[in-house]
Amino acid sequence: MKLLNTFSILFTLTAISNTNIGISQNESTNPILEKNYWESYSIEDKDFGTKTYVTLTKVYRKMTTNALPNHETGQFPNVGNPNKITAQNLTYEIPLNPKLSGKSNWVREPGVALNGVKFEPETAERFVCETGEVYRIEAFQELLDLGLDQNNAHVQPTGAYHYHGIPTGLINSLNPKDDIVHVGFAMDGFPIYYSQSGQYKPSFQLSEKLRTGDACSYKNPHQNLELDLNDSAPDGIFVSDWVFIEGLGDLDECNGTLLNGSYVYFVTDEYPYMSRCLKGIFKEESRPGPPPNHRRDDELIQEFK
């Protein structure tokens, strides 16, 4: 199966202090009931070290978590990823009553899974060309080994384990009986689902526009590559290889749709794998580093509009 930002929340860091999941006030004997995740709940897994606690206020769904997954992962560090999974100290405040904003806004981290592991579809890897182009590399491609595991996830230098695609281990731990599986919440408060049958299709396809760029290079401590991209055809290696075609599939430019009259997002087996933009109101995060370029963030969102 091929799989493979501006938080929608107020994001703060706090210190928080192994799979039992339950309602905080009225403990459940069934740890996998989806309805639990709409209320206050906790996940503590002694085997994997997961500690995630969710409470509801009048305004927010507040999650404090160490962001350790409650399922098996790949071996880290590995050849493509030199980082070790470590506990984080995070608090998310996600809008409890989400509202659509009327526009689509690009977002680096579109949401967080039920277990406290964040979703982050794009990577920090890029090819830089002497002619000025910058191509951001997709997580799911065959040019570079980024060390993704069986859960379509790997680890950042901070030790943060994060999903780039379908969170396979999380879904298996939920043991879902229905096709539509609730896997998390977007930063604007709308839920994130996965369809086991793949009935909701994305609306992206490869661009027909040839690339530009001479003497393009990628460098990190472990890999160095040189490419001449001028007049090459998009093949999915780079974010800018893909374009949104309205009506091509079932989902919109943010990989969302209306489900039973309410807006939701989907993680999917096909590109873009998860939301790269959000439709709801959320507090934007100041993104560090150089500004987006070469048809990435700003231009892509203009296309969405």
Task: Write out the residue ranges for each language-model feature.
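Sec-dependent N-terminal signal peptides
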Residues: 4-15
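A surface/extracellular/periplasmic glyco- and lipid-processing/surface-interacting theme
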Residues: 136-151, 157-159, 172, 182, ...
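Bacterial Sec-dependent signal peptides at the C-terminal "C-region" and cleavage site
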Residues: 13-25
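Extended, compositionally biased non-globular segments
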Residues: 188-190, 195-292, 302-304
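Extracellular/lumenal glycan-associated surfaces
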Residues: 113-118, 157-170, 259-272
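A short, polar beta-strand/turn micro-motif
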Residues: 63-106, 121, 160, 165-201, ...
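Solvent-exposed N-terminal domain segments of exported/luminal and surface proteins
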Residues: 22-145, 149-151
